Amino acid sequence: MDVWVIGGGLAGSEAALTLADLGFPVTLFEMRPAVMTPAHKTSKLAELVCSNSLGSLSTDNAKGELLFELKVLGSSLVNLAFEAQIGGDKALVVDRELFSTLVEDAVRSHRNITVVRAEITEIPKDVPCIIAPGPLIKGDLLHFLEEREGRCEAQYYDATSPSILSETIDMDYAFWGNRFGEGSDYLNVPLSKEEYYWFVEQLLNAREAHRHDFDKPDAFFERCLPVEEIARRGKESLAFGPMRPTGLAIPEKFRDVHAVIQLRKENASGTILNMVGFQTGISHTEQISIFKQLPAFKNAVFVRLGQIHQNRFLPGVVNKFFQSRTNRLWFYAGQFTGTEGYLEAIAGGLWAGINVARLLGGEKLIPLPEESMLGGLVTYIEQSLPEVKQPMGVNWGLVPPVEGKKSERKQKRVDRARIAIEYAARELGRVT
């Protein structure tokens, strides 16, 4: 019997490849293009709908540690991400289109995977399944899972940022450079104090799309706040947040620089640039109007505009193996479990895939050590209470504290996590 994988996002694609590589036949269901979501623009598998950055490459950063652990465990999508990597300072930034194409090709060409383009509304209870529908799930499947799991969905709002054709930006008002280091991965558009305050005022007065659907501040995910929400917290909030000029070597021709708008390459050729940290729910007409009043963007052509979309997840439905508490054949993966972030979604798909393979192969399910970053995340998700309303991305608070001098704790924590995940990889038979 084939293992069903529901959802062709990051988690579902990773789960399908993990199982298929282990010799299990997989049927991967993806509802696009027949049924699209508010955030997706294509029918490709593993489409990146927000940023094109998978997180930090820094060894002492929580994302960087998770990335290391996924490489140790043999993640297919992480390997493909490095194939699609473009400049990104200390982050794993990928060519959005190339990455999705590589994943699509890997999945469709695998002899053990059958891709079915159809919407699934219910799941037979005796079918081994990895449920990875993503946070944009709604309708019949959501209601089916709520009923079977005895849990109610949690809701929050996420946002995407605009992208611009690079050749339409006036370079007389911009410069390339990275914060705190060499390189030129980011295009920086400096704003004077006067321009900055004007810009903030425009954001505060702009008309928003469907504001009545998300009029409570706590409905937004804190790590992906729209710029207009940040601006409401204080006039200088953006200047000390995503628009901070700190660490940039600013050319002399730019005077009185109070803030910067940063853009990052979205593809390898650099023909499209994405605004960094500029998620917004302002109406599309107002976005174009506001940005085009800044000299650098007066002739800008926007290939994508920011928007807000509603996300959902089911807290408290899985154990430490991402296995359903109500059906031992069902496993969950991705943001629908309550994780947040691209890498976290990939991690969920990998972990669920490993455990389904072990279950069907008659092997004992082995828990991850809590000292590892992935183990800490899995433990948090397992212990999440039904009333949890916000998803969780990786951070060092998920792992147990370490003893010793403060100056030594950071490295001790990293060393301990790496020893733990390498031990787990051997136990799970994931050593390559």
UniProtKB/Swiss-Prot annotation:
Annotated FAD binding sites: G7, G8, G9, L10, A11, G12
Catalytic activity: uridine(54) in tRNA + (6R)-5,10-methylene-5,6,7,8-tetrahydrofolate + NADH + H(+) = 5-methyluridine(54) in tRNA + (6S)-5,6,7,8-tetrahydrofolate + NAD(+); uridine(54) in tRNA + (6R)-5,10-methylene-5,6,7,8-tetrahydrofolate + NADPH + H(+) = 5-methyluridine(54) in tRNA + (6S)-5,6,7,8-tetrahydrofolate + NADP(+)
Compartment(s) where it occurs, according to its Swiss-Prot or TrEMBL record: Cytoplasm
Classification via Pfam families: GIDA (PF01134)
Enzyme Commission numbers on file: 2.1.1.74
Gene3D superfamilies listed in its UniProt record: FAD/NAD(P)-binding domain (3.50.50.60)
Principal cellular location given in the protein's record: cytoplasm
Keyword Flavoprotein: yes
UniProt entry tagged with the keyword Flavoprotein: yes
Cofactor(s) this protein requires: FAD
Record keywords, A-Z: Cytoplasm, FAD, Flavoprotein, Methyltransferase, NAD, NADP, Transferase, tRNA processing
Function (record text): Catalyzes the folate-dependent formation of 5-methyl-uridine at position 54 (M-5-U54) in all tRNAs.
Family: Belongs to the MnmG family. TrmFO subfamily.
Protein name: Methylenetetrahydrofolate--tRNA-(uracil-5-)-methyltransferase TrmFO
Organism the protein comes from: Coprothermobacter proteolyticus (strain ATCC 35245 / DSM 5265 / OCM 4 / BT)
Lineage, opening ranks: Bacteria, Pseudomonadati, Coprothermobacterota, Coprothermobacteria, Coprothermobacterales
UniProt gene name: trmFO
